[in-house]
């Protein structure tokens, strides 16, 4: 449906809603809002709006809905699939929530915090710590990503094994619908069996059904015991076996199990100028963390004994248990720095895929075979959250082929990897979402019934299709 009024007139009305200091219409100042942090997705917009409160968001959406103006919600713009970047039509308005950044309430007794959507994740974490609690969502981009974006993409991260995805950390939600109406469900209740759990519609829907403006999130006791180790392993099957044994031995104390292959370690050594972790090179590495808020747990001894047992079982070749905070920080820095290092070393295609944990070795091995067949001599890097079945897979352009040749191969590489993933009952998007990058995969790998249900929900909540279309 076409825009019903003079476009410039509508833009002026939108500016009036937020006030003169809360919008950008100068093209020269818009660039940070029109491309993603990896510089892979680019768009255009006539106006960047920065509302100060929910009422402003409501008025913006009501006006846009009435006049069929497309809206792209944006948080920290740290996504990896282009979901917060407008298209190149120059007709989509960006609604950036960065100024809605207040911590509204913290209740240590109830273990909850109420926040606005524009709060930076690291600030939420730090505020929780001041109240002697933690908010466990942890991402490499936590210094710039915003809680609203985390929830609308159902972010994962390094603590999913113990605490779950973002949507499992939410009790209540406020969201503005496409027509400007406000759904206020900011309940701080762990038990509330009064009809449909409507907040789930907005968690993971990437701003396509409305804009999350506030949330009640869960807090947890600060772990009083924490121990971290880097473990070297010769084969993938032993990596999975190690995870199984550690979970059996530690119960609920294992809080992270991150994976990096040898290629990842090599590129970190090369790019960061650091020493190798062990005297000998190994094919696979696991970053393991145990944590507990129970004061009488001796996690150091538990982890050391568990690893020693797996050395005897030939599932572990070597290990270092961190003896101080400096070592802990170094180990985690390796894993968290890796994506940023990889994005700077050449042209690549990347995957965010998941399968049942027991099938991870089959996925990784078969994916490497396919990549080598399609694109010989390519550099492949595999890392991720093996503890929850999520792998990140980077394949780089070989030196002997041109960028154009590599770009022509990308589609075949993607479809081959996604086909393998689908055959293993996996997902082509484990934690990064759909965005712009994976629209075609959504149509191809999702059943007709599921697609039709999504369309029914979208049509019901956003009949004019203005929300992040």
Question: For each of these PLM feature ranges, what is it?
Answer:
Residues 1-37, 66-69, 310-326, 423-428, ...:
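N-terminal accessory segments
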Residues 28, 75-77, 140, 262, ...:
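Short, ordered loop/turn segments at secondary-structure junctions
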Residues 1-62, 79-111, 264-275, 325-352, ...:
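N-terminal flexible segment immediately upstream of the FAD-binding catalytic core
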Residues 24-31, 230-233, 238-412, 416, ...:
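C-terminal substrate-recognition/cap domain of FAD-linked oxidoreductases
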Residues 181, 438-469:
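Activity-critical C-terminal alpha-helical subdomain
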């Amino acid at each position: 449906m076409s825009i019903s009024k003079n476009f410039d007139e509508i833009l002026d009305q939108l500016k009036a809603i937020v006030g003169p200091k809360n919008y950008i219409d100068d093209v020269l100042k818009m660039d940070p809002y029109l491309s993603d942090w990896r510089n892979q997705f680019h768009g255009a917009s006539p106006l960047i709006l920065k509302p100060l409160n929910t009422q402003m968001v409501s008025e913006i959406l009501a006006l846009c809905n009435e006049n069929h103006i497309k809206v792209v919600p944006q948080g920290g713009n740290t996504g990896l699939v282009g979901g917060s970047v407008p298209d190149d039509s120059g007709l989509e308005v960006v609604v950036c929530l960065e100024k809605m950044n207040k911590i509204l309430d913290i209740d240590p007794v109830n273990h909850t915090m109420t926040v606005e959507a524009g709060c930076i994740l690291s600030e939420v974490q730090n505020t929780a710590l001041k109240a002697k609690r933690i908010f466990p969502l942890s991402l490499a981009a936590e210094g710039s990503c915003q809680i609203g974006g985390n929830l609308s993409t159902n972010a994962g991260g390094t603590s999913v094994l113990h605490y779950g995805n973002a949507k499992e950390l939410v009790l209540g939600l406020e969201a503005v619908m496409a027509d400007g109406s406000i759904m206020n469900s900011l309940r701080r209740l762990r038990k509330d069996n009064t009809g449909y759990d409507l907040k789930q519609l907005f968690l993971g829907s990437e701003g396509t059904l409305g804009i999350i403006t506030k949330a009640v999130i869960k807090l947890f006791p600060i772990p009083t015991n924490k121990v971290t180790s880097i473990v070297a392993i010769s084969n993938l099957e032993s990596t999975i076996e190690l995870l199984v044994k550690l979970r059996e031995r530690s119960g609920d104390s294992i809080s992270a199990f991150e994976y990096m292959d040898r290629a990842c370690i090599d590129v970190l050594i090369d790019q960061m100028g650091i020493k190798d972790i062990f005297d000998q090179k190994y094919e696979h590495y696991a970053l393991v963390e145990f944590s507990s808020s129970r004061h009488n747990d001796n996690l150091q001894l538990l982890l050391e004994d568990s690893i020693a047992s797996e050395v005897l079982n030939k599932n572990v070749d070597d290990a270092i248990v961190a003896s101080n905070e400096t070592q802990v920080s170094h180990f985690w820095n390796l894993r968290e720095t890796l994506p940023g290092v990889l994005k700077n070393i050449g042209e690549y295609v990347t995957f965010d895929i998941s399968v049942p944990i027991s099938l991870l070795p089959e996925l990784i091995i078969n994916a490497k075979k396919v990549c080598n067949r399609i694109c010989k001599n390519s550099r492949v890097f595999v890392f991720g959250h093996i503890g929850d079945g999520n792998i990140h897979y980077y394949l780089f352009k070989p030196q002997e082929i041109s960028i154009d040749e590599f770009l022509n191969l990308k589609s075949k590489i993607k479809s081959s990897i996604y086909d393998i993933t689908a055959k293993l009952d996996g997902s082509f998007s484990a934690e990064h979402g759909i965005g712009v990058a994976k629209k075609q995969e959504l149509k191809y790998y999702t059943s007709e019934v599921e697609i039709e249900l999504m369309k029914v929900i979208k049509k019901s909540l956003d009949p004019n299709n203005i929300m992040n279309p």
